[in-house]
Amino acid sequence: MMITRWLFSTNHKDIGTLYMIFGAWAGMVGTALSLLIRAELSQPGALLGDDQIYNVVVTAHAFVMIFFMVMPIMIGGFGNWLIPLMIGAPDMAFPRMNNMSFWLLPPSLLLLLASSGVEAGAGTGWTVYPPLAGNLAHAGASVDLTIFSLHLAGVSSILGAINFITTVINMKPPTMTQYQTPLFIWSVLVTAVLLLLSLPVLAAGITMLLTDRNLNTTFFDPAGGGDPILYQHLFWFFGHPEVYILILPGFGMISHIVAYYSGKKEPFGYMGMVWAMMAIGLLGFIVWAHHMFTVGMDVDTRAYFTSATMIIAIPTGVKVFSWLATLHGGVTKWDTPLLWALGFIFLFTVGGLTGIVLANSSLDIILHDTYYVVAHFHYVLSMGAVFAIMGGLVHWFPLMTGYTLHNTWTKIHFGVMFTGVNLTFFPQHFLGLAGMPRRYSDYPDAYTLWNTVSSIGSLISLIAVIMFMFILWEAFSAKREVLIVEMTTTNVEWLHGCPPPHHTYEEPAFVQAPR
């Protein structure tokens, strides 16, 4: 029974739960790695060993957090759980492929962890640039194992993307148009399209790197007529859409949370929200070289990428102000998910503003590869994506389990987490402006103060993670059952009770055609 249910599952709710649990474990691994980084940097001098070990930890931290924490939880966990419920589908379009998408991830994580354990590990950074990632600077199997790990995670995401696109377009009730689906559906649809278009390019790039390393090809080796800059273009053509893949489902979740706790039946400016997400998805593909301002591109090329990058701020602003407009004039229910959503809106906006700064190619020459960049993307990831995940978890936990989290504990947890991440990442702006470079395990004494502050912040975040584990245990232990859910007519995922039965919508939902 256990084996057929959890290993061979074709049920979207069970697979979503598997994704959630996997993401939680990977999140703890990624958090542990981040604490190793902050411990090393808490004061000048060496702690763990040389820079190779340090960079292996940094690389593993990035890969684990991106591919095994944020994406599995947001897309695999929330996507699987909510999308069929929100559109009235009995399950995903391809339930067995859905199962394979999940089970490709544990071996992928295993390969990634193995890459750290053999030879000297892959100390390349998550970008895996040659020639550092070539077979001279990284002899041995480490980088090859990392590449295979990425291949598996990539195949998993591509299959998942196909599944989500098919489900969202094809499994709605016949009278329901795409413009009647909730915003979370749209966010995952756009995300899936981005995955489908960007991952094959990454696969091509890392496959060429694999053959450069093992089969004597010279795609990225000038000695044989290749060009390492080609790899950068291929990687970032995937890498930039990837960061939007990480945040877009969060946008969808935040829209639902803000509308729900404002007591509104719908978010402000539904169509604007939809088009903003589609615009972000499109623009995300034509700005990739802003990661490469320092490699010597023509001035007109740099001018274009600066301008195009800044244009993304417009649809993003549409979303931020629509969230604020949704809050306006509502009957605000100050529950924990709303706190996460408000934290998201504020901190994501701060991260977006530093992004505008970095979009200026001339400024980026100075700030590239400094802690200013680290601060920027951790504001949008560690306080954007993670806050969205936390808000979504606290909001939908009763739906997924049938139990309620402790109201006071979750609020305290939010406060601790908010303090921790801000104390960790805000000082890094100062370090970057003062010229401290990324990816070094040691630094001049002048940078000591803010690094120490940052590392103390990371310990506060650790306390928050441990608190959250306790909060989950407490909920399953106390077993407070859900009494009533408000506004189910505009939040249809709650219609079947908490938790919903194993199979929902076994006969098609009736949707009144618009007059």
UniProtKB/Swiss-Prot annotation:
Any one Gene Ontology cellular component term annotated for this protein: mitochondrial inner membrane
Keywords, alphabetical: Calcium, Copper, Electron transport, Heme, Iron, Magnesium, Membrane, Metal-binding, Mitochondrion, Mitochondrion inner membrane, Respiratory chain, Sodium, Translocase, Transmembrane, Transmembrane helix, Transport
Residue spans crossing the bilayer: 12-40, 51-86, 95-117, 141-170, 183-212, 228-261, 270-286, 299-327, 336-357, 371-400, 407-433, 447-478
Documented EC number(s): 7.1.1.9
Protein's membrane topology: Multi-pass membrane protein
GO biological process: electron transport coupled proton transport; mitochondrial electron transport, cytochrome c to oxygen; response to cadmium ion; response to methylmercury
InterPro entries for the chain: Cyt_c_oxase-like_su1_dom, Cyt_c_oxase-like_su1_sf, Cyt_C_Oxase_1, Cyt_c_Oxase_su1_BS, Cyt_c_oxase_su1_dom
Pathway given in the UniProt record: Energy metabolism; oxidative phosphorylation
Subcellular location: Mitochondrion inner membrane
Major place of residence: mitochondrion
Note accompanying the cofactor annotation: Binds 2 heme A groups non-covalently per subunit. Binds a copper B center.
Protein's recorded name: Cytochrome c oxidase subunit 1
Organism: Latimeria chalumnae
Organism lineage string: Eukaryota, Metazoa, Chordata, Craniata, Vertebrata
Gene from which the chain derives: MT-CO1
